[in-house]
Amino acid sequence: MTARIDDTAAEENPRAVARARFVRVTPMKARRVVELIKGRSASEALAVLQFAPQAASGPVSKVLASAVANAENNLSLDPDTLWVHRAYVDEGPTLKRFRPRAQGRAYRIRKRTSHITVEVESRPKKVASKSKSQKGSAR
């Protein structure tokens, strides 16, 4: 296999990553919350997570705040220019427990864990351009 060199890769925006591993929340429920923040600005994503009713929004919010802090402290980036570039949830190990049932039976309980990863990217702020035609303007 040969690796192709991409010209746009040289001009990539700086990125910072934060991971939380072995979080005691099911990956399926965490993915629901992560989908809310993909592609949003970091400040907007934190606001969305603050008011999200899901229990998984707490750990996801902490990971996002950590990624923003990593960008600010390690890469000297402005927090106002940060966007959620990638966010995903991987499945961690499952703790297996048993619940005793009637007549000597036992049901298995699976306590699932997640690995949450959030990657923020610094994008330059866009300057508002003047529109070509303005309503009601004298020509």
From Swiss-Prot:
- Please indicate which superkingdom the organism of origin belongs to: Bacteria
Q: Name one GO cellular component term.
A: cytosolic large ribosomal subunit
Gene3D superfamilies reported for this sequence = Ribosomal protein L22/L17
NCBIfam families reported in the protein's UniProt record:
rplV_bact
Q: According to its UniProt record, what is one Pfam family this protein matches?
A: Ribosomal_L22
Bias kind Basic residues: ranges: 125-139
Q: From the UniProt entry, list the residue stretches annotated as the region Disordered.
A: 118-139
The record's annotation in PANTHER family points to: CHLOROPLAST 50S RIBOSOMAL PROTEIN L22-RELATED (PTHR13501), LARGE RIBOSOMAL SUBUNIT PROTEIN UL22M (PTHR13501:SF8)
What name is this protein filed under? Large ribosomal subunit protein uL22
Family note: Belongs to the universal ribosomal protein uL22 family.
The record's PROSITE patterns line, in alphabetical order, gives:
RIBOSOMAL_L22
Asked if the Swiss-Prot or TrEMBL record annotates the protein with the keyword Amino-acid biosynthesis, the reply is no
| The species this protein was found in | Saccharopolyspora erythraea (strain ATCC 11635 / DSM 40517 / JCM 4748 / NBRC 13426 / NCIMB 8594 / NRRL 2338)
Q: Which UniProt keywords apply?
A: Ribonucleoprotein, Ribosomal protein, RNA-binding, rRNA-binding
Q: Record keywords: Zinc included? A: no
What does the protein in this record do?
Answer: This protein binds specifically to 23S rRNA; its binding is stimulated by other ribosomal proteins, e.g. L4, L17, and L20. It is important during the early stages of 50S assembly. It makes multiple contacts with different domains of the 23S rRNA in the assembled 50S subunit and ribosome. The globular domain of the protein is located near the polypeptide exit tunnel on the outside of the subunit, while an extended beta-hairpin is found that lines the wall of the exit tunnel in the center of the 70S ribosome.
Give one GO molecular function term: rRNA binding
- Please give the biological process terms from Gene Ontology that the record holds: translation
Q: How does it assemble?
A: Part of the 50S ribosomal subunit.
